[in-house]
Amino acid sequence: SLITQLYREQIHNVDGEGLGILIFDYKGDYNESKTDFVNATNATILKPYHLPFNPLALVKSSVFKPLLPTHTANAFKDTLSKVYNLGPKQQATLLQCIMDAYTVSGINPGNPATWDEEAPTFDQVYQRYANDEEIKKGDSLAAALDKLHMFQVFEANPSNTKSLFEILSGVVVIDLSGYDADIQSLIVAITLDLFYSQMQAAGSSKMDGNYRQL
């Protein structure tokens, strides 16, 4: 397959830099049952259970971005809202819960010196939502958050999370087979959003003449 060929030829990348290849596997075409593929690529298989990255982690780039926690919270809110069709009030509630979780973690959006504090995870946001008796439950926001919490999609302990760039060493497969379409869509959207943010922070890859590092 193309993936296997890329994996085998990565030594020819500029500076011999290893490739990180991420596969969203909707049908189970690349999971543990496909031993030939796994053995040929030494692939890491992840399930949508305690995924080891934090969608609320703050990714700082060389170009300063004011109010980074607010932008990060808003991006997560937007992604969840699109997948679950949340209304304006529900979006505002979710955004406030995320911002409250940042505050409890010692992160102040207006103070960049606090941005290196450990970012809250989805589980911490969910606990704030679930324990706030003033928030009206029983709507689509509750259904969305309850489902993500019930399936334990994201790692709850921030100390056990890594950046996507750290995780993407070699071939990494997120096995989405057997999960509902909404969970599949959310995981893909959040992962790509996070990957884009980290790519921006990392900057352009190295050029060697007419060749760019992959």
Task: State where each predicted segment sits.
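P-loop NTPase motor domains
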Residues: 2-214
